[in-house]
Amino acid sequence: MSNVVQARDNSQVFGVARIYASFNDTFVHVTDLSGKETIARVTGGMKVKADRDESSPYAAMLAAQDVAAKCKEVGITAVHVKIRATGGTRTKTPGPGGQAALRALARSGLRIGRIEDVTPVPSDSTRKKGGRRGRRL
């Protein structure tokens, strides 16, 4: 199968951009619509040297720009965005890189279709880490 997607004239070729923004790193992962084939996957940690900067908005922006360039190479012109935080028993708010990655994808010329939050939310979860009296500083 060839990696270049053919588009009919005047139509968008969609992919799915999955942005996982934790407080330690940001992943920008683009797949085809079915989710089976990975087109590009770049993390904030691949773009910066210091460990503390992996989750920064700047690292997320660089990662998203790399992914967008690869998408255009392959022929994808638009993406549906699924943004995700750590979730579960941990935080349900995306890290600092989530917003920056989304903005960088839009500014790099990719059309944005739907934006969806797919953070896993427990219906009735296991016990949260930290014990009965919580984390004591």
Curated annotation (Swiss-Prot):
Gene Ontology biological-process entries: cytoplasmic translation; maturation of SSU-rRNA from tricistronic rRNA transcript (SSU-rRNA, 5.8S rRNA, LSU-rRNA); ribosomal small subunit assembly; translation
PTM (free text): N-terminally acetylated by acetyltransferase NatA.
Keyword Ribonucleoprotein on entry: yes
UniProtKB keywords: Acetylation, Cytoplasm, Nucleus, Ribonucleoprotein, Ribosomal protein, Ribosome biogenesis, rRNA processing
Gene3D superfamilies attached to this UniProt entry: Ribosomal protein S11
SUPFAM superfamilies: Translational machinery components
InterPro entries to which the protein is assigned, alphabetical: Ribosomal_uS11, Ribosomal_uS11_CS, Ribosomal_uS11_sf
GO cellular-component term (any): 90S preribosome
Localisation per UniProt entry: Cytoplasm; Nucleus, Nucleolus
Gene Ontology molecular-function annotations: mRNA binding; structural constituent of ribosome
A Pfam family: Ribosomal_S11
Residues carrying N-acetylserine: 2
Region ranges (Disordered): 117-137
Feature: compositional bias, Basic residues: 128-137
Biological role: Component of the ribosome, a large ribonucleoprotein complex responsible for the synthesis of proteins in the cell. The small ribosomal subunit (SSU) binds messenger RNAs (mRNAs) and translates the encoded message by selecting cognate aminoacyl-transfer RNA (tRNA) molecules. The large subunit (LSU) contains the ribosomal catalytic site termed the peptidyl transferase center (PTC), which catalyzes the formation of peptide bonds, thereby polymerizing the amino acids delivered by tRNAs into a polypeptide chain.
Note: Present with 29600 molecules/cell in log phase SD medium.
Record's subunit section: Component of the small ribosomal subunit (SSU). Mature yeast ribosomes consist of a small (40S) and a large (60S) subunit. The 40S small subunit contains 1 molecule of ribosomal RNA (18S rRNA) and 33 different proteins (encoded by 57 genes). The large 60S subunit contains 3 rRNA molecules (25S, 5.8S and 5S rRNA) and 46 different proteins (encoded by 81 genes). uS11 interacts with eS1 forming part of the mRNA exit tunnel. uS11 interacts with snoRNA U3. uS11 interacts with MPP10. Component of the ribosomal small subunit (SSU) processome composed of at least 40 protein subunits and snoRNA U3.
Protein name (Swiss-Prot/TrEMBL): Small ribosomal subunit protein uS11A
UniProt lineage: Eukaryota, Fungi, Dikarya, Ascomycota, Saccharomycotina
